[in-house]
Amino acid sequence: MARLFTPSESKYYLMALDAGTGSIRAVIFDLEGNQIAVGQAEWRHLAVPDVPGSMEFDLNKNWQLACECMRQALHNAGIAPEYIAAVSACSMREGIVLYNNDGTPIWACANVDARAAREVSELKELHNNTFENKVYRATGQTLALSAIPRLLWLAHHRSDIYRQASTITMISDWLAYMLSGELAVDPSNAGTTGLLDLTTRDWKPALLDMAGLRADILSPVKETGTLLGVVSSHAAELCGLKAGTPVVVGGGDVQLGCLGLGVVRPAQTAVLGGTFWQQVVNLAAPVTDPEMNVRVNPHVIPGMVQAESISFFTGLTMRWFRDAFCAEEKLIAERLGIDTYTLLEEMASRVPPGSWGVMPIFSDRMRFKTWYHAAPSFINLSIDPDKCNKATLFRALEENASIVSACNLQQIADFSNIHPTSLVFAGGGSKGKLWSQILADVSGLPVNIPVVKEATALGCAIAAGVGAGIFSSMAETGERLVRWERTHTPDPEKHELYQDSRDKWQAVYQDQLGLVDHGLTTSLWKAPGL
């Protein structure tokens, strides 16, 4: 590719738009991967009245927020728009956007929109109850968060929108479209629709035909890092970027996060610790899990896929515990000028491994085909305040998250026969030194912590640089730019202790699922259609 910019001649930067579940961010990096500035705004995805499980994505308001973030990032960086060499976008997966014939976005939903529960059940019965299996074998996805039941819901309940729809994209593609006026999807994000073939990295319209849905709404597929278009004059007025700035195809947040971590080769493994914890393992070729417990997604690196097993609400659970029970610690931490989690970790470090036998019951390991969880609770508490207190419960939560993570990695190993020798731990959870060490002790693997905490945005910026001709290879650039802050080595004795804790927790969790099955307790989360 011809170089559009010569970094040695001028100081250029790359912008990444990161559309997460809870916020939109515009992050500016220099060409060595250093974060220069960020603009951020929270957004909320509200339920539609009388539509249970819905999570609408407000296209007009959220585009305004995205533009504000881009302007804020440019202002905070103190650089002129002409020095942004290229921009790309990544987003939460599963969220979809529909457009009419004029190219106007007309409807969108966020990632865990669960309005289509009845449609999921209906689709599962198709073709002698084999339809979901056919979808999974071809795409690596089940129906729970797929676009197929959502489209069927629109056909049933909003036929006006369904009839108008002429194109479908992901939220990252919508951002790129709003900047450039060009519509396309990339495999890594579109793969989560349940409509993209893992092997060909292209749409599989036969699945829509099998579901009795229209197959004429599928937009062009372009690989991450491909030049899509340029910022239009209209978009430039709104967002502050210069008209003509290259707009590059982005991708899914997890896969681009792995690019930003240099996790770009087969068998490399990462744990991304945010609101959800994603345990991902790179696979050299498409393969799916015979038990259908694990999802499989296209990587942003062509030809490679990622087995992904998800822990539910891990980061959210920690935030709930902090906000619900640790008001005193929040005040103390504020006076000390430290993060509340840092103080809680210091307290938890004095609790012995195993947390006096306390067992948190929150997320289960991923069971993609029948995905639900037990009711949130703590089991095996003691009334001895020296043994059962906030520090004990906090450590127990960190240990349990690590146990669930290890279970998720194990079930990937069971079907892929890939046994990692180390793992990368990134995201908010990796800021905790105690948590990182516990993950090493539980998994029995060395845990590497990167310097860059904005791995997803960095991966997106790398894609922008490739599309602009600044970088020649996404994989090589990801490996070159990643830097390591520290490594945690597992303690064999603690690993053995945690193996016993893991076995006990798995047995207790199964009993807790039974209470949900009998209607005695309420699941933490249940996939649509169960």
UniProtKB/Swiss-Prot annotation:
GO cellular-component term (any): cytoplasm
Keyword field: Cytoplasm, Kinase, Transferase
MF annotations from Gene Ontology: autoinducer-2 kinase activity
Primary location class: cytoplasm
Subcellular location: Cytoplasm
Domain of life of the organism encoding this protein: Bacteria
Protein's GO biological process: carbohydrate metabolic process; quorum sensing
Enzyme Commission number, as recorded: 2.7.1.189
Catalytic activity: (S)-4,5-dihydroxypentane-2,3-dione + ATP = (2S)-2-hydroxy-3,4-dioxopentyl phosphate + ADP + H(+)
InterPro entries reported for this sequence: AI-2_kinase, ATPase_NBD, Carb_kinase_FGGY, FGGY_C, FGGY_Carb_Kinase, FGGY_N
Enzyme class: transferase
Main function: Catalyzes the phosphorylation of autoinducer-2 (AI-2) to phospho-AI-2, which subsequently inactivates the transcriptional regulator LsrR and leads to the transcription of the lsr operon. Phosphorylates the ring-open form of (S)-4,5-dihydroxypentane-2,3-dione (DPD), which is the precursor to all AI-2 signaling molecules, at the C5 position.
Sequence similarity: Belongs to the FGGY kinase family.
Protein name: Autoinducer-2 kinase
Species whose genome carries this gene: Escherichia coli (strain SMS-3-5 / SECEC)
Gene name for this UniProt entry: lsrK
